Amino acid sequence: MTLFLPGQEQRTRVASAIAALLATAFVVLAITGTARMYTPVPYWDMWSATLGFYMAVNDGASWLWWAQHNEHRIVLSRLLFWLDYEIFGGKSIFLLVMNYVIVAMAVVLFWRISRAQLAHLSDPARRNTVFFTTCFLVAWLYQWMQQENLAWAFQSQFFLAQLLPLCAFYVLHKSALNDKAQLTFVAACLLGITSAGTMANGILALPLMVAYALIAR
């Protein structure tokens, strides 16, 4: 059992507060930067890939849902683009919010992974390590270095192309730990299939999952 002396506990609390403040600062600064850069006017690829797509689909060109955007098939992002125009007035606010929501989902996924990987530690060491790791991940994923992705309403596919394959592998790993986890395995397969609708690199998720399933069988 790990023993924490009063002085150590106090230092841990101070360090935790600092880590939480820094992580919060990164998020607040990112949101502030996004708000300052916001414009409802479509930018660059958005003219054809969001506004043009929405108008064409409404005119009956349903095949565009699966059409390539360069080498990618951005089916899931097109669903978000369609919702933005159909429900939220095409002002891109919904799309920007979704960028942050998807990143938050990635943080939650990494939090779950870190908890599982650190399960061998005893409390409070495990709890503190997971907390500091999560704060670091929040700051890392919301850093303004990737402002072009966070502040541009067209970029949800870049986040989804990382999140969904990672989710698929995580769920597949969970199913491998339990011989009776058929539903979990099906969910992993569905996530792998869905990954193909993010970007071109998402196509690799299913073949790699098959390889992992054979190894972990």
Task: Indicate where each model-derived feature is located.
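Start-transfer (signal-anchor) and selected internal transmembrane alpha helices
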Residues: 1-30
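Perimembrane helix-loop-helix junctions
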Residues: 2-6, 204-217
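Helix-to-loop transition at the C-terminal end of transmembrane segments
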Residues: 29-49, 145-149
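Membrane-proximal lumenal/periplasmic loop motifs of glycosylation machinery
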Residues: 37-42, 55-86, 91-101
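Transmembrane-helix motifs of polytopic, lipid-linked glycan transferases
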Residues: 97-124, 167-171
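Transmembrane-helix signature of polytopic, membrane-embedded enzymes
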Residues: 114-143, 162-163
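Membrane-interface transmembrane helices that cradle and orient dolichyl/undecaprenyl
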Residues: 160-184
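Membrane-interface alpha helices of multi-pass inner-membrane proteins
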Residues: 183-198, 205-210
